[in-house]
Amino acid sequence: MTRYVLLPSPLVGAATWRPVAEVLRAGGASVAVASTDGCTTPEQVQAAYVAAVPPGDGAMVLVPHSNAGYLAANVAAAVGSAGVVYVDAALPASTGPTTLAPSELLDFLAGLADEDGVLPPWTQWWDDSDGLFPDDATRAEVEADQSRLPLAYFRSAVRPPTGWTARPSGYLAFGDTYAEELERAISLGWPTRVLEGGHLHQLHDPAAVAAGITELSSRIA
């Protein structure tokens, strides 16, 4: 039995993965969803991801979404994960350190931080984020689970383990939000799949996203 550990972005929290977790469990998989509540540094977030991995036998697959993709290779090395399925996620550099936000995003975030250097909740970064959610109730659930991270989090850098791109990996993209990362995954020879949708498509169609994760997991086994 495959064991999935779903890694949410520290910006939006575990609520973004709960519908997919329910679908995967209904299909007979073992599923854990990491919580990054209270985490404000990359080290704390990585530790929370590692702590979410339950003991047990069987193939284990990490499933990072969005910003969690930067840390997934380090988590996989720490827990001995069998593979990683990146879901509309950022990817670190193949070698050397990677800042936890691209330079153009850092410039944008610098203008959002308050006098203490703390950013507003993620859904307040944008003029209109309503299209990201299927309904008001789902939006409220996600907003209740959001954390406010310091700007310093995104100015930090992570250094993935040497040779991390050789670990069995797949990439599930939602539309073209992470088009460059998708192209990179293809160039690395990873199996890929694209579902048309926004960045939180797992909230709109958890069954399709769960099916995509399951398919890619079987292709990297």
Range-by-range predicted roles:
Residues 2-57:
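Active-site catalytic motif of lipid deacylating hydrolases and related acyltransferases
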